[in-house]
């Protein structure tokens, strides 16, 4: 490795450190740590043990990020000093040692970057993913089933557990809607990159004239919650209906009214669950889904208020396509947010979507 190449690597690291600092909002995190330390020094701190543990966990998490950043910064400065020394006094052994340390530090940078990419609230949670085909009948419904397979394969590749919470089959082929629970560490952190409208362009196998069709499927992604959030759902605000399960399942399908539909009357948000044999378990799961949807709604309303204050206008509905999957007249998958492209459409449909997820998360970091 030439000294000029080492210098280029160190300059790249300096640029990444600046991005890390901005993403971390270092000054505000240090101020928050000082706040929490002050709380922990209070003689009455342990009177409420649950609250105390929450404060300790937050402080430890913030300190981990800040200390990791400072350690990377110090290591980078040390390597920069070694590089400057080598410019003045070349030394083969010292340069080899510098190359070795540079490689090790690059690995630490990448690991820290991944921590930052998945450091938002609830990134670590399981994910609830919903697919809703747009207008277009069988063609759109078939596109929905293709995306269902894609996300299922992606989850399996990562060692995640994929469960079907609700499934409404299409009239001839595909799906009218599906809700998945994807269980695994950081499942929501990754899959939040998939929220939006997915567009398919292909020669439709359902069109005897062999014409090219464009289809759309909306993908909604929410974190699964246990008791992390305070969403108050009053009994009088919900309407619960039961019905017979209609999707693929066990022998219980269409034999008992085990499926549950819950409507939140103030917002008209509807959730359904039919994956369990027990109506009680389906209701428990449906309530978790409702909690997630109401949380998502709250966050989106807050974001809309911020956008209005900033004067930002965002496309909504079927115009807000995040990705196009073109099978004809050429093969290409393109993410419109990051301009990331892949020519191997079949690999993408087999679950190879990490390139798009990674590019999106990194774009949010910078």
Curated annotation (Swiss-Prot):
Modified residues (N5-methylglutamine): 251
Free-text description of this protein's post-translational modifications in UniProt: Methylated by PrmC. Methylation increases the termination efficiency of RF2.
Locations listed in the record: Cytoplasm
SMART domains: PCRF
Taxonomy, superkingdom: Bacteria
Record-linked InterPro entries: PCRF, Pep_chain_release_fac_I, Pep_chain_release_fac_I_sf, PrfB
UniProt GO BP: viral translational frameshifting
Gene Ontology CC entries for this record: cytoplasm
UniProt-listed Pfam families: PCRF, RF-1
GO terms for MF: translation release factor activity, codon specific
Keywords: Cytoplasm, Methylation, Protein biosynthesis
Other noteworthy facts: The gene for this protein contains a UGA in-frame termination codon after Leu-24; a naturally occurring frameshift enables complete translation of RF-2. This provides a mechanism for the protein to regulate its own production.
Its biological purpose: Peptide chain release factor 2 directs the termination of translation in response to the peptide chain termination codons UGA and UAA.
Family as reported in the entry's similarity comment: Belongs to the prokaryotic/mitochondrial release factor family.
Name the UniProt record assigns to this protein: Peptide chain release factor 2
Protein source organism: Bacillus subtilis (strain 168)
Lineage, opening ranks: Bacteria, Bacillati, Bacillota, Bacilli, Bacillales
Gene: prfB
